[in-house]
């Protein structure tokens, strides 16, 4: 069984120098001095580092996140803030235009309120854009299912355009689960410059969100 005599901090750059002399027994670190493995906490730290490194690789200091008011996009915004700082994160808010009933109007108002609340708690600025009416653009009636798919494509286009305009990196909230189950629907659409949750199952995001909310309760659960 080995003994740990020195350790660098986890998920941080550091220079660790430990002198070792032949025949000299060094004191080992106590168990309480060693980091305790907590999968969700370490996963979050790894994701923060991944966003920071990818932004550097893209030559960008800022990131754009499409805010939808749901868990994945809210958690992604919090991740970007932890990685780059709130002043370097922009939230894109895309309105919905296919609202026909009072219930839909109420749901959209609640969604917009949730999005603005998340942006306020994270101290990030938002860019609001309106989605074009698919039926008018295509000059035909569009079913609800087609309209939702077209909105997803439009959101990707708006995300790409906003990122290009601001010289920022576009982040995608897609998880490993969505890449596996919705691959045909994703083909042909813009999915951002980087998807931090691409190797994280959708079911894991809830547990990661709880870890992030211990710092400050910004992510809806």
Please give the residue ranges for each predicted region.
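RNA-binding accessory domains that recognize and position tRNA/RNA substrates
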Residues: 1-66, 74, 81-88
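A conserved beta-strand->alpha-helix junction
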Residues: 12-22, 88-146, 157, 161, ...
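A conditional alpha-helix N-cap/helix-loop micro-motif detector
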Residues: 44, 108, 149-153
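Residues on a specific face of well-ordered alpha-helices
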Residues: 45, 49, 78, 113, ...
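Beta-sheet entry/capping signal
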Residues: 62, 88-90, 125, 167-170
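Generic beta-strand/beta-sheet core signal
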Residues: 66-68, 74, 92-95, 129-132, ...
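Short glycine/serine/threonine-rich phosphate/pyrophosphate-binding segments
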Residues: 73-76, 100
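Active-site adenylate/phosphate-handling loop in enzymes that bind or generate adenylated species
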Residues: 84, 97-101, 122, 137-218
